[in-house]
Amino acid sequence: MTLEIRAACSPGEVRIAVMNDDTLVDFAIWRPGRTDGVGDLHRGRITARVPAMAGAFVALDGADGFLPDTEGAAGATAGTILGVQITRAAQGNKGPRLTAKLDAHEQAMIGSGPPVLVRRGPGPLSRLAALHPEAPVLLDDPGLAATLRPTLGARLTLVRAAFDAELSARIDALADPIVDLPGGASLSIHPTPALTAIDVDAGATTATRGVKGAVQFALNRGILPMLAAEIRLRNLSGAILVDFAGLAARRREALGPALTDALANDPLRPRLLGFTRLGLAEIVRPRIHPPLHELLVGPHAAGLAALRQAASDIAVNPGRALALRAAPSIIAALQPDPVALDDLARRAGRSLVLRADPSLHATAWVLEPAIA
C-alpha cells in the first residue's frame, strides 16, 4: 500500500486527493478565501440565552454561532465575552456549532474586547496530512508550496501537475448522482435537506444464471465497499438511507455486519442504526464540514470554475488578456474573496477584467478577450 496526497491548485481553490496506489480514498476542496471555519478560534459575545434549545447564540466576527449548554453555555448570560471554537460548519440557515471547552493556551489567546477571529483552524490539506502522516504531499503551485514547506518539510514535493487526466475524471465523477459499478449495477445518490437517499440498481447483473435471491444478496454484499467509499468521498453526512436491490426487507438485515465493516475505515465513524420496516438501511454520519454537493453549487463555486479555466487558458497562451463576463451574482461572490482574483493576477501578470451581465443565469459565465 502506497499512500500519496495530491493537491491540484487553481485560483482560490485547492482540490486534494488522497490516493492508495491507484485508488482514490479521500477527497476535499480547500478554498482559502472562503473557509468553512471549522477549528477557528474566536472571541465571542453571548447575545441571547435560548433555554428551549439548551444553549445560547454567540456573536462572532461576521457571523453568529450556537453554543450548547453542554459545551459551555450553561450559566452564562447575555453580554458575556468568552472564547469559542467552531466544531461544525454552518448548515443552511443554521450558524456554526461552537464549543467553549478550550485548553489553557487557547484560553490565554482570547483576551478582552469585541468579537474577533483569534486564529484560523487547519485547512483540509493540513487535516489530511495529519490523518496520513507518512504520505508524501505532491503540490503544483510554487507559491503555496513555499507557504506550506515550513510545516510539511521534506514531505512536500512540487510537481508540474498534481492530477492526471484519469484522476481528474474520477474527481469530476463525484459530482454525478449516478455511480456506475462493475457488472452493470449502479448507485443513485440524491441528497435532500433532510437526508441523503441512495438507491442500489442491480441493472443486468441479476440476469446471471443461478438462484435469484442468492445472486441479489451477493450483488448487494459486493457493492458495500464501493458504497462506503462514495459516502466518504462525497462527505455525505447526517441521515443516509440506502435501498438495496431486489431483496425482501427481512433479508436485508443480513447485510448489516458487512455494511458495518465497510464503514469502519471512515475516520468520521459512521454508524449503521439498523433497517426500517421497509428494509432501508439507516446510516448516520457526523456532519462537520459541508458535503461535496453543497460546495459544488452556487455563484462562488461557478466563479472559481471560471478562474480555473482562465488559468488553464493563460498557461497555454501567456500573453492573452481575458475578461470574465458572468452573472452579477458570480461577480459579487468573487469580489470579496481575498485570495482568488489576486491568485489569478499573480499567475497571469495582470488582473482579470470582470463584466457583470444580468442576462446570464445566476451561475453562467463566459471567458472572452479583455478588449472587446
Predicted feature locations:
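Extended, charged alpha/beta regions that create polyanion-binding interfaces
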Residues: 1-36, 40-43, 47, 81, ...
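Flexible, charged surface loops at secondary-structure boundaries
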Residues: 10, 50-51, 77-78, 127-134, ...
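Alpha-helical multi-pass transmembrane bundles of energy-transducing inner-membrane proteins
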Residues: 65-78, 89, 93, 244-245
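Beta-strand/loop nucleic-acid-binding surfaces
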Residues: 28-33, 57, 63-75
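Short, structured coil segments at secondary-structure junctions
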Residues: 61-62, 151-152, 348
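Short, acidic/hydrophobic/Gly-rich beta-strand patch recurrent on exposed beta strands
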Residues: 17-18, 56-61, 66-68, 85, ...
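Conserved glycine-centered short motifs in functionally critical loops
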Residues: 3, 54-58, 90-100, 106, ...
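Extended acidic low-complexity intrinsically disordered segments
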Residues: 51, 63-65, 146, 328-330, ...
